[in-house]
Amino acid sequence: FEYYPPKTEGGVSALVHKRLPSMAKQRPLYIDMTWGAGGSTSDLTLELCRQAKELYGLEANMHLTCTNMEVEKITKGLEGARAAGIRNIVALRGDPPAGEEKWQAVEGGFTCALDLVTHIRKEHGDYFCLSVAGYPEGHPTVIKDVAPGQQLTPAEQKRVVYSTDEDGGEKLQVCFDADYANEIAYLKKKVDAGADLIITQMFFDVEVLLQFVRDCRAAGIAVPIIPGIMMISTYAGFKRMLGFCKTRVPPTIAAEIEALKDDKKGLTEY
């Protein structure tokens, strides 16, 4: 289960005293807690991970990102994790800060998750279990528009994302084969640098995930791959995440969700 640090005291209390103990009954392998750009939630993220572990025996997997993070901040975050008894880190580049479209490294900071994994292994050896992100459909930044009449390979056809343009017409996007191969090669570099497992971006097409796993294994990536599954709570949230992640939704599933868009209870149960 993945959690975002709440923005209010009431939200924090509800998470610690209601949601975490309720979720703990499901006996998850771990819970992970996100990390705000520039360490904006660092203290709260650390405290929530500590409480999840101490109060409910949950294995905490703490996000750590490169966004607006000087090396000194990353060092402080890792030291805080060790002090709190947290031994699991999700090493990520991170998304651009709110209001910005393009990701940029801070001066003297890391440029990617590979840099972060390499740094953690160099400074902390095998103390931390490191997770990294994997993208079965390709990272959103390399999922590109398909030109009208452009031919796609069989592999690309299975990854193609259907959406609508500003005029309501059909729009096709895909991570082309060359970019997809680069994605797999980069993922292997992260694993070779010391990542212990891969957590995937959310997906709705199981065949896309299975092909991703096959491609990883063929590339020599042998670490466990944990599927990332989005729990749909609202139609608006579902559509927002589709746009943000550029996720493929099989037509049958898309039609079923569309039919439930005004039925909150039915959508949650779905």
Question: Which residues make up each language-model segment?
Answer:
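Hydrophobic faces of well-ordered beta-strands that scaffold small-molecule active sites
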Residues: 1-6, 29-33, 60-64, 89-91, ...
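A generic, well-ordered mixed alpha/beta core segment in the N-terminal half of proteins
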Residues: 64-66, 70-97
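N-terminal beta1-alpha1-beta2 module of alpha/beta enzyme domains
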Residues: 1-36
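Catalytic beta/alpha-barrel core
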Residues: 30-41, 64-65, 89-92, 177-179, ...
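Active-site pocket-lining/capping segments in soluble small-molecule metabolic enzymes
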Residues: 10, 108-178, 183-184, 214, ...
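Active-site-adjacent beta->alpha loops and helix N-cap segments on the catalytic face
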Residues: 10-14, 39-51, 70-76, 96-123, ...
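Acidic (Asp/Glu)-rich catalytic clusters
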Residues: 20-27, 46-57, 78-86, 121-125, ...
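Active-site cofactor/substrate anionic-group-binding motifs, chiefly glycine-
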Residues: 25-67
